[in-house]
Each structure stands twice: as C-alpha cells, then as structure tokens.
Design a protein with these regions (language model features):
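A glycine/threonine-rich phosphate-anchoring loop and its flanking beta-alpha core
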Residues: 13, 23, 106-202, 293-296, ...
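Gly/Pro-rich interdomain helix-loop hinge
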Residues: 266-338
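Short, amphipathic C-terminal "tail helix"
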Residues: 336-373
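N-terminal small/polar loop signature for handling phosphorylated ligands or for N-terminal nucleophile
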Residues: 45-113, 118-119, 222-234
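Glycine-rich phosphate/pyrophosphate-binding beta-alpha loops
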Residues: 135, 242-275, 350-355
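ATP/NTP phosphate-donor binding region
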Residues: 1-85, 329
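Glycine-rich phosphate/diphosphate-binding loops and the adjacent beta-loop-alpha structural elements
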Residues: 195-250, 261-264
Length: 373
C-alpha cells in the first residue's frame, strides 16, 4: 500500500480577503517607526490607502523582470530607511523583491549566499504582501525569482523565512489592470494550478487547491477581461492566484514554466504572457500521460470533453487567443534563430523540467517553441 508523500505547507501567518482590505494593514501593523514599500510607479498610487504611522519610504523602480541590480538598489534604499516593516505592493515581481529585501537588508548574507533551497539564515523584519494583480500568487509563497542578465537565467531562492506575516487580497486594487494583462496573468495563475495538478510530484492535498484555482479561472477570467470592474470575477481570480501560489510551495511548476523562463530572460516578455503562449502546447504534450487530469482541466476551462491531443491544443489556443492574447512568438519579436538557445536554456532548468509528467528532450522543447512561433 502506497503512502501519501510527506509535504510541508507554508502559508502567511495572517490572510485578509475582501474589498477595501488594504485599509486593514495599518491596524495589523500597529506602532511602526519606519516602513519601506516596494512598488511600481503605478502601484505606488495605493500607498496612501495604507495609512501607516511613522516614516514611509517608497522604492518603485521595479521592472517586469527584476534583475540583480534591481535587488541591489532596493537593498540600498532599505539600508537608508532601516525599516521595521517591509510592504510589497504590486504583482509578483514586486513581491519577490520585497521577500528578499525583508530577509537581507540587515543581514550579512548576499543573494549568492541564499540562492537555492533553505539557505536564508532568518528574518527580523516584518513583511506584508498586498497583491495588485491576480497571477503569480507570490503573496502565498516562500520563493523569490531574480534574473541574472549576464547568464540570462533566473536565480531561485526558497525559504520559509520568505513567507509573509500578512497577505492581503483586495480585489479593488485590480480594477485598473488592463484587459491584456488581466488575461495573461490569469493564464499564469491557471498554469501554476495545472502544472502542479499534473506534476510527477502531485499531492492529493495540493490537488484540492489546484482544482479550486483552475475552476475559478475557467469561470471568471473571460468576465474580468471583458469588464475590469466586475468585482465577483476579480475576487475569484485573486483567490485562484492565491491557490496557485500555494501549489508552488510543496509541488511547484513543471515544463510550462521552464519553457516560459527564457522568453522572459532573453526575449523580455512579461512572465504571464510568456506562460500563456506556451500553455496550450505543454498541456497537449502532457495529455497522453496525464489523461484524466488533463480532461478535468479541459472541462473546467470549457474546452470540451473527449478531445484528441490536436483538438485539445487547438481549443486551448483558442481559449487564450479569445482573451486577447497574441499567441505568436514571432509577433513578439522572436526569430527562428532564437529558438535553439531558448530550448537549450529551458531544458537545463531541471528543478522544473524533472517535475513534468512527460519526459521532454531538447528537441521536444524546441518543437514547442516552433509550434508557438
């Protein structure tokens, strides 16, 4: 008799969900002498809603794919501010930087020291994560990704010391997210759930979160793209994103994200868009070895029942394209000459590729890029 694999599930110490709940942060924070908010120029517009006491500094120079230099600049800002509270106010890039900042600003450890799993020595600064997009689910997790532009690769840091003390899911903060960004980040949230659900490392407990996540995306993503102020849809996607973030902890993603990463580091596509472009092709590739679970995903997304591999790919492509996502790599500036480098880099990301239900050769990965071209 096989036993259920042992997993450790980390979640934020406190989670607040609901409209207007950004206003609850000040009550939770209590007496704070110095706060550093990590944001983008757009999300910095929400800082006043925090109503935090004491000194509040804002670092808003966070690009779509934060690099080592981004983290270094944020660390310099933190050492000047000496915060007793760090707030990540934004999407995944913002929250990933906030995690590392809270752990490293007053530490002798560097990014190189903590790269990998369970190398962060500790954290003395409180961390609040406030999601302003529904995609990465970074507010739920213990991982942070920073791009090394010289190597063209992502540096992954995983540690329970990166988990938030407080996470806030306030769907009102997502009303102004443009339709095309809503679409791409929504597919990213779905991909987290689907990749964990079909993974070689799938776990029955995480399957429950994954199911809730991709069902919510199937129900609400098109609605939110059509009407950004549809609160029910926006809130459903925030929950889907959070559930996807939970999936990343003990199970993680697989080939889909590995194949998407070079599109961010080398082609400089936003993370959600990169994942959306490859999602239909990876879903179809894995179908022969994950038939029951793939069929469940297809049903939840309204793709149909009893689909052939080719029909599944076509329907999933249609699902993404109907959301307004441009699904051609060529249209995003890629050339055919780029594809072998993308494939080699993606195939080398073994921490994700080894989770995939179907083994992929470099040629298989190249085939997915060509199908996406």
């Amino acid at each position: 008799m096989s036993s259920v694999p042992v997993i450790i599930l980390h979640q934020p110490k406190r989670l607040i969900v609901g409209a207007g709940t950004i206003g609850e942060v000040c009550t939770w924070a209590g007496e704070v002498s110095s706060t550093l908010v990590i944001a983008t120029p757009i999300t910095a517009g929400f800082v006043d809603r925090l109503k935090l006491p004491g000194k509040v500094a804002v670092f808003d120079a966070i690009p779509g794919e934060p690099e080592i230099a981004t983290l270094d600049a944020a660390l310099a800002a933190a050492r000047a501010a000496k915060p007793d509270l760090v707030v990540g106010l934004g999407g995944g890039s913002v929250m990933d930087v906030a995690k590392l900042l809270a752990a490293l600003w007053d530490s002798e450890q560097t990014l190189a020291d903590v790269a990998g799993s369970n190398k962060v020595a500790g954290r003395s600064t409180r961390l609040a994560q406030i999601a302003t997009t529904a995609g990465t689910g970074s507010e739920a997790g213990i991982r942070s990704l920073i791009t090394d532009p010289i190597k063209g690769a992502k540096i992954a840091v995983e540690s329970p010391h990166l988990i938030a003390d407080l996470a806030v899911l306030d769907a009102e903060l997502t009303y102004s997210v443009p339709p095309v960004v809503t679409a791409a980040t929504g597919v990213d949230a779905m991909a987290h759930c689907v990749e964990a659900f079909t993974s070689k490392r799938a776990h029955p407990m995480i399957d429950g979160f994954a199911r809730m996540g991709f069902h919510l995306v199937g129900k609400y993503l098109a609605r939110a793209v059509k009407d950004g102020s549809d609160h029910e849809a926006r809130e459903g996607l925030m929950l889907a994103s959070y559930y996807g973030g939970i999936c990343l902890g003990p199970v993680n993603t697989a080939a889909g994200h590995a194949i998407a990463y070079p599109l961010g580091t080398l082609l400089h596509l936003p993370h959600g868009l990169a994942n959306a472009i490859v999602f239909p092709h990876v879903l179809a590739f894995n179908e022969p070895v994950a038939q029951e679970k793939t069929a469940e995903v297809a049903q939840a997304l309204g793709l149909g029942h009893g689909l052939s591999q080719a029909k599944l790919r076509a329907e999933a492509l249609g699902f993404c394209a109907d959301l307004g996502i441009e699904m051609s790599l060529a249209k995003h500036g890629a050339t055919e000459a780029d594809l072998p480098r993308f494939a080699a880099d993606a195939h080398a990301i073994r921490r994700l590729m080894d989770n995939n239900p179907a083994d992929m050769s470099v040629d298989d990965v190249l085939g997915i890029y060509r199908a996406s071209f």
